[in-house]
Amino acid sequence: MVRIVFKFLIPSVRAGRRGLRRASKLGLILAALAALSACAWLDTKQRQLVYRPTPGVPAGFTGLRVGDLSFATQVPGVEPGTRDSLQMWWLPHANSRAPTLLYLHGTFRNLYRNLPKIDALREAGFSVLAVDYRGWGESSPIIPSEATIYADANVAWAELARRQPEPRLRVIFGHSLGGGVAVELASRMRHGSDYAALILESTFTSLPDVASAAGWLGSLGALFASQKFDSAGKIAKVDAPILMLHGDADQTVPVALGRQLRDAARKDTRWVEISGGSHSRLHSDAPEAYQQALKLLIAQLG
């Protein structure tokens, strides 16, 4: 009788164990899917908070100057099989032999809000190709990411190279987060054969470092940052002359982070620290020092 009981009991126990294992695996899969969903949600929220892109054209904008060009190009979309629109401006200098600068802006403000700084760069002697990453201005309205911004900068650089065939007259410029984009771009190219110089204004070491500088809550957020822009880890690969400008009254990116980035770069990096300079208006906070630094760089390009 005992043997008969065990004969039926043992297979039942084994089946129960197999069922538990299957249930455990299913539970792990469901937990993993839930975690991935939470991570995806967190990543989306991070990107919305970090970039805060400004779409559209501001009220009251009357257009670019005569001779300046606003145009769009098509790029692979975020969703497979789709196409997105990438808006660029071509703002040539009166001197046809002027060096050409790729303008990479930071968070929040689109190109329309960057016009005063762009005008200051043209005043110094640059032709300017400026790009609104997808999510900003008249480019396709997406929630941008570090990857999409890098991709957009690559497309803009190809356009600049088409318009300016001489590498010795090509310059990369990045303001704030745009500096992180500029460092990424420059770190994958070579001085002389690809471009001539890199200009960074109000730029940071990395986004997690900016968050940490805001206090303990920012330090906690930095632990979960999906958007890095790790310029400090890349800038040593930049072999071209570098000009860095930063205001000592910058309330967005502390000047200490700019100094740390300078220290991670090549030893002959030129550092211009503007007394009382803010985050976004160095061109108007100290116009003489700003213009002098840019014109000296242009003179060195030959």
Q: What kind of feature is each model-predicted range?
A:
Residues 181-240:
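Hydrolase active-site cap/lid region
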Residues 36-78:
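An N-terminal hydrophobic leader/cap segment in hydrolases
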Residues 117, 240, 254-263:
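Short alpha-helix in the alpha/beta-hydrolase fold that links the catalytic acid
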Residues 165-176:
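Alpha/beta-hydrolase fold nucleophile elbow
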Residues 238, 244-246, 250:
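Short beta-strand/loop motif that positions the catalytic acidic residue
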Residues 82-159:
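Membrane-embedded segments
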Residues 249-253, 280-281:
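Acidic catalytic loop of the alpha/beta-hydrolase fold
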Residues 277-287:
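Catalytic histidine-centered segment of alpha/beta-hydrolase-like enzymes
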